[in-house]
Amino acid sequence: MPQKTEDNNAIFDDDFIKLDLYDEEENKVWYDLEQNGQMIDIAVVPIKEEIEKYILDIEDAEEPFNENVNLNIADEIFVIGFPFGRIGGILPIWKKASVASEPSLDLNDMPYYFADTATKSGMSGSPVVLYEKRPVVIAESLQGKFSKYRTKFVGVYSGRIGANSDNKNDAQLGRVWKVDMVDKIIDQFEK
């Protein structure tokens, strides 16, 4: 969930974007979802104002002709975020991971799968992408233009299992919420 600051804002960076997390009556402004009596650990914050700085719509970042992704066990994926807050400056760190459980099945009746990765604090809420080295068409209007890499948004990372444990030999498994949960949360609130 977004972190509340003293002035009820979420701050992405001192120089970037400041979003209110609560309205004047102290009601949360983000969207979340409960399933099977448990919270899905994804928050969607609606952005109602035009923002011109550093924003790239995830759909614009994907190759439009490669939408069908079959995510499999052992596929290499990346968790893109800011470990410990701001390491890396304005650009995120790409932490390599691999799919560690069957991604087409829910775990504990919840829509997530495990990733094998050694992530650290600050990565929760990060997008998870499949990033494969293979040529793909960039856009129909750019016929004959190819990218060397295929990138596809495949989930939202929400932390390691056993992260609060003193055991330094924990399994280093992270929970990745399935990408369709983002659409489900938005659809529920935008009806």
Language-model-derived ranges and their functions:
Residues 1-110, 116-117, 121, 125, ...:
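Serine endopeptidase catalytic core focused on the charge-relay Asp
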Residues 81, 153-163:
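Short beta->alpha transition motifs characteristic of CBS
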Residues 94, 135-139, 191:
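Alpha-helix termini
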Residues 159-191:
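C-terminal tail/extension regions appended to the core domain(s) of diverse proteins
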Residues 117-156:
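Catalytic nucleophile loop of clan PA
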Residues 9, 32-35, 133-147, 162-168:
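Low-complexity, polar-biased intrinsically disordered regions enriched in Pro/Ser/Thr/Gly
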